[in-house]
């Protein structure tokens, strides 16, 4: 069902498409067919030859199918240019516009003035009829507010400013003086030069600046006042736009001031070139085909035909206006045709024909003219269109130019001053600065006065400078012949740029400080200092060739090689030493415990000597552990148990490894070469990832600081070190020496000098950011080439090498450092003094301990003697008491004995009774007696009567009358034989401390 409906509707859809497209197609055919088939081209020409050539050109055009479509015919309508502009206007209306001209080609006699072409332009422009001028070059025709439909196949005069820029770039002139009239064309050429130079110099290296602008009123009578200002200026290159009459006055007065001779450069426009007193050596411009009316007529006709052909193919062209009186006519096709004309770009008889937005001819060729003797004009160059590059190109044969003063060599273009203002800065070893003493009136022969720059203080002149750069300056001034005033940097800085926002400016402007700022602002002529060449500075000042090539390096304090008293401890870290000490005592304790609690630790052989070695105690265990560690002989106090001996073997192995490692590491540590630096260079990971205990810095605002800003890969490092940057290099170097700063990043020349002067400092790693030190000069300075050539000669002659040895490397100091570094790394007393001191400390400790022991022993002996004396006195006192008791007992026994003799008891019975009373058990054998001082004889006398017999026998009792037993006398003798001393009695104690005096 759906398919059937679609088949039924399809014819209706096709019909609708046809009905819609048909009107459009018809309109297109109408557009092409409704365009006029005939086109009238008007001509307002200056002479009959031009009129005839105009007619002939249009006739030939009709046969050129490249420019004329089929069924299109061109016709010419010409009138003669009248000197009266009002008549010209009426002629244009009556003879051209009434004939429906689509465009007008106009020319005039240049001597008759420019008002006639302006009249044609005003009249035609009112009706939007395009006008193509072939001779009018005044700047006024570029104003589209007035000449709304005017084009020209010749460039305006002020376009010669473009050629001036090309010539200045070719001759490398950087400062110029512009002389121009105060009329429209004069001001237009100045504006064109200033505007074009802003974009032109973005593509070239040499930038020309306008030092002075001299504007004069036309129809001069005298130019003397302006010449006075020009003579005081530095530039000697004059760009002049003036009429032929005014140029005669200027050249006349300039010749009187000797400003047209040697050393001066004049580049003038076409009008001035035709002055009858143009000096020899003047360079001027002359437009190619400037007076070829026929060529310009042909080019204008073909440009017009090309535009109409393209317009016919794209849109409908309405008929041109027919009546000047019809003010209501607004011919839009004329405006569109004017836009098509401006977009043309063809190759014609006068060269490449194209137009800018103002309808002015571009790509016009010029001849560079050199004025010779007798006003002869010689072509020495061309400024023409290069079809390969699609742009204009300057070609000048310098060898054919004769400059003012009949010179073949190109002038410098500026007045070269022979007395210069020089600036420097204190930077060792390149510039040393000292203040003069109160009694000094002049500097030393190798010094030069260097007051502070622009300082009115009287003390500012009391400085003298010497050093590498000062010696270079002295030799440089002799070589290229100049005098100078030397001054110090006012703020002590090389200078860096600050971005400032000028009033009314949309972009930030760089403003330089320090030495660079003085040079940029032209307050100084030259900088003689260790000034690093870098892109930021080279954009604003000029540099000579480097007088010293260098780079950036790192300064650090050399790792200490001095031997301390504990050098022998350095092979092991403090932690390891502590662990070893702890291990000794832990092992000793474990050995003691193993030997103490082992069941075999106190085992003795049954038949062993009673003096066999005792078991291991704690003191012996410590002694054993230390003895094994120190590899000393162990004669006693060894472990007895198996478990303790196993641990002892393990400890011996541990001690062997520790001692061997210590010995090897000691040899490597004290004898082998140690690294000279802590850092390996700029790529050291510790710098790239800066740690808290590692500080690095440079000088803020310096060339090194700019280098780190440029390098993206160093951005992280720069952010870290930026806060640590110093104001001067001197402060940073002092902090490196003191250990406050670990790494100072600066120019290699300065750091190598510091390292050669102080053996404690060393540069780390390879150079990076290689550059050089150069002499700084103003942009366009005439001294640049001379200074560069002189420096190159100094390099070739060896003078720069001599300065390096004299000021930077300090040969004798460096040699001493090398001797220090190359000393054989053998062990000496300073390396091992700590060991000897340790032995001395051990000896002193032993002597001290023995003294303490002796003193302590003497104290103990004295105390023991006092105790012995007291004990002896107490024993004597007790003995005396006991003797008295014994005497009493003896007397009692004697009395009893005597009584017994007289009684019925037998003597034997009495003796037995006495013995029983004294000895409850007579069979008990008395133990061994101890003798104490002074009682040996008493003991024998006392015990002799009571000596016991052999076991199993009765005691042997001696009678009083027995020999050897004297009969005691009453009151005089005590019977000592019957009573023992009290200390042999049961319960006796020897404590006599209470008797000690």
From Swiss-Prot:
Residues 27-573, 673-831 are extracellular. Residues 595-651, 853-997 are cytoplasmic. It is a multi-pass membrane protein. Residues 947-997 are annotated as: Disordered. The chain crosses the membrane at residues 574-594, 652-672, 832-852. Glycine binds at residues 530-532, 537, 703, 747. GO terms for biological process: behavioral response to ethanol; calcium ion homeostasis; chemical synaptic transmission; ionotropic glutamate receptor signaling pathway; long-term memory; medium-term memory; olfactory learning; phototaxis. Residues 1-26 form the signal peptide. Keywords: Calcium, Cell membrane, Disulfide bond, Glycoprotein, Ion channel, Ion transport, Ligand-gated ion channel, Magnesium, Membrane, Phosphoprotein, Postsynaptic cell membrane, Receptor, Signal, Synapse, Transmembrane, Transmembrane helix, Transport. The keyword Phosphoprotein applies. Pfam families: ANF_receptor, CaM_bdg_C0, Lig_chan, Lig_chan-Glu_bd. InterPro entries: ANF_lig-bd_rcpt (IPR001828), CaM-bd_C0_NMDA_rcpt_NR1 (IPR018882), Glu/Gly-bd (IPR019594), Iono_Glu_rcpt_met (IPR001508), Ionotropic_Glu_rcpt (IPR015683), Iontro_rcpt_C (IPR001320), NMDA1-like_ligand-bd (IPR049872), NMDA1-like_N (IPR049873). GO terms for cellular component: NMDA selective glutamate receptor complex; postsynaptic density; postsynaptic membrane. One of its GO terms (molecular function) is NMDA glutamate receptor activity. SUPFAM superfamilies: Periplasmic binding protein-like I (SSF53822), Periplasmic binding protein-like II (SSF53850), Voltage-gated potassium channels (SSF81324). The keyword Magnesium applies. Its main location: membrane. Glycans are attached at residues 258, 314, 345, 397, 454, 481, 501, 693. It is found in: Cell membrane; Postsynaptic cell membrane; Postsynaptic density. Belongs to the glutamate-gated ion channel (TC 1.A.10.1) family. NMDA receptor subtype of glutamate-gated ion channels with high calcium permeability and voltage-dependent sensitivity to magnesium. Mediated by glycine. This protein plays a key role in synaptic plasticity, synaptogenesis, excitotoxicity, memory acquisition and learning. It mediates neuronal functions in glutamate neurotransmission. Is involved in the cell surface targeting of NMDA receptors. Plays a role in associative learning and in long-term memory consolidation. Forms a heteromeric NMDA channel with Nmdar2. This is Glutamate [NMDA] receptor subunit 1.
């Amino acid at each position: 069902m759906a398919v059937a409906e679609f088949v039924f509707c399809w014819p209706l859809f096709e019909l609708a498409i046809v009905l819609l497209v048909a009107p459009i197609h018809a309109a297109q055919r109408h557009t092409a067919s409704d365009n006029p088939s005939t086109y009238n081209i008007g001509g307002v020409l200056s002479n009959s030859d031009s009129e005839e050539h105009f007619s002939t050109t249009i006739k030939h055009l009709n046969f050129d199918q490249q420019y004329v479509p089929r069924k299109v015919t061109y016709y010419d309508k010409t009138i003669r240019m009248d000197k009266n502009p009002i008549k010209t206007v009426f002629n244009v209306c009556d003879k051209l516009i009434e004939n429906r001209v689509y465009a007008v080609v106009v020319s005039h006699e240049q001597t008759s003035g420019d008002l006639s072409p302006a009249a044609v332009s005003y009249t035609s422009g009112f009706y939007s009829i395009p006008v193509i001028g072939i001779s009018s070059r005044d700047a006024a025709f570029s104003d589209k507010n007035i000449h709304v439909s005017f084009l020209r196949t010749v460039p305006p005069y002020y376009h010669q400013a473009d050629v001036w820029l090309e010539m200045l770039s070719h001759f490398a002139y950087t400062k110029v003086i512009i002389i121009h009239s105060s009329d429209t064309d004069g001001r237009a050429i100045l504006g064109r030069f200033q505007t074009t130079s802003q974009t032109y110099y973005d593509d070239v290296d040499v930038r020309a600046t306008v030092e002075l602008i001299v504007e004069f009123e036309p129809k001069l009578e005298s130019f003397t006042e302006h010449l006075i200002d020009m003579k005081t200026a530095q530039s000697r290159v004059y760009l002049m736009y003036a009429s032929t009459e005014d140029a005669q006055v200027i050249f006349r007065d300039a010749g009187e001031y000797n400003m047209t001779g040697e050393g001066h450069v004049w580049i003038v426009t076409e009008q001035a070139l035709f002055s009858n007193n143009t000096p020899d050596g003047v360079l001027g411009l002359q437009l190619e085909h400037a007076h070829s009316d026929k060529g310009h007529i042909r080019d204008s006709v073909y440009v017009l035909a090309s535009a109409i052909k393209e317009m016919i193919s794209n849109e409908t062209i309405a008929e041109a206006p027919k009546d000047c009186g019809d003010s209501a006519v607004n011919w839009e096709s004329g405006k569109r045709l004017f836009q098509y004309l401006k977009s043309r770009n063809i190759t014609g008889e006068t060269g490449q024909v194209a137009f800018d937005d103002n309808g002015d001819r571009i790509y016009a060729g010029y001849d560079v003219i050199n004025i010779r003797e007798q006003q002869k004009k010689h072509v020495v160059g061309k400024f023409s269109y290069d079809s390969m590059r699609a742009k204009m190109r300057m070609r000048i044969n310098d060898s054919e130019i004769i400059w003012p003063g009949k010179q073949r060599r190109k002038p410098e273009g500026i007045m070269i001053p022979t007395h210069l203002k020089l600036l420097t800065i204190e930077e060792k070893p390149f510039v040393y600065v000292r203040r003069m003493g109160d009694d000094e009136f002049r500097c030393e022969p190798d010094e030069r006065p260097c007051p502070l720059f622009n300082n009115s203080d009287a003390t500012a002149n009391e400085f003298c400078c010497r050093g590498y750069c000062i010696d270079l300056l002295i030799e440089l001034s002799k070589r290229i012949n100049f005098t100078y005033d030397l001054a110090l940097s006012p703020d002590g800085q090389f200078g860096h740029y600050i971005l400032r926002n000028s009033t009314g400016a949309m972009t930030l402007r760089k403003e330089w400080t320090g030495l660079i700022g003085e040079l940029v602002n032209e307050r100084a002529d030259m900088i003689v200092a260790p000034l690093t060449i870098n892109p930021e500075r080279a954009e604003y000042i000029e540099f000579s060739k480097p007088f010293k090539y260098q780079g950036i390096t790192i300064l650090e304090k050399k790792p200490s090689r001095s031997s301390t008293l504990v050098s022998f401890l350095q092979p092991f870290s403090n932690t390891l030493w502590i662990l070893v000490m702890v291990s000794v005592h832990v092992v000793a304790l474990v050995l003691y415990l193993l030997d103490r609690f082992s069941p075999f630790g106190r085992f003795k052989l049954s038949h062993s000597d009673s003096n066999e070695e005792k078991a291991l105690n704690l003191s012996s265990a410590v002694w054993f552990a230390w003895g094994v560690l120190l590899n000393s002989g162990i004669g006693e106090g060894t472990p007895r148990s198996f478990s303790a001996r196993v641990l002892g073997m393990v400890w011996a192995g541990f001690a062997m490894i520790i001692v061997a490692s210590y010995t090897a590491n000691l040899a490597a540590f004290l004898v082998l070469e140690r690294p000279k630096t802590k850092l390996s260079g700029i790529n050291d990971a510790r710098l790239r990832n800066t740690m808290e205990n590692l500080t690095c810095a440079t000088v803020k605002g310096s060339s090194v600081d700019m280098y780190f800003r440029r390098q993206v890969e160093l951005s992280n490092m720069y952010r870290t070190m930026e806060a640590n940057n110093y104001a001067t290099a001197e402060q940073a170097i002092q902090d490196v020496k003191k250990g406050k700063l670990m790494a100072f990043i600066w120019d290699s020349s300065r750091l190598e000098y510091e390292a050669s002067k102080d053996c404690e400092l060393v540069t780390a790693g390879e150079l990076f950011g290689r550059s050089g030190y150069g002499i700084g000069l103003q942009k366009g300075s005439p001294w640049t080439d001379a200074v560069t050539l002189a420096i190159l000669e100094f390099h070739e002659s060896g003078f720069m090498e001599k300065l390096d040895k004299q000021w930077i490397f300090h040969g004798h100091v460096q040699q001493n450092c090398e001797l220090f570094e190359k000393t054989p790394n053998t062990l000496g007393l300073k390396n091992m003094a700590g060991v000897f001191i340790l032995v001395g400390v051990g000896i002193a400790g032993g002597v001290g301990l023995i003294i303490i022991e002796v003193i302590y022993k003497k104290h103990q002996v004295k105390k023991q003697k006092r105790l012995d004396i007291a004990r002896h006195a107490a024993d004597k006192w007790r003995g005396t008491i006991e003797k008295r008791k014994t005497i009493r007992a003896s007397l009692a026994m004697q009395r009893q004995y005597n009584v017994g003799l007289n009684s019925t008891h037998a003597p034997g019975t009495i003796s037995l009774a006495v013995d029983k009373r004294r000895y409850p058990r007579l069979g008990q054998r008395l133990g061994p007696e101890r003798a104490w001082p002074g009682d040996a004889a008493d003991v024998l006398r006392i015990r002799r009567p009571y000596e016991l017999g052999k076991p199993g026998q009765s005691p042997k009792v001696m009678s009083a009358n027995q020999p050897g037993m004297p009969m005691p006398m009453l009151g005089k003798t005590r019977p000592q034989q019957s009573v023992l001393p009290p200390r042999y009695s049961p319960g006796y104690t020897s404590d006599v401390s209470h008797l000690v005096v």
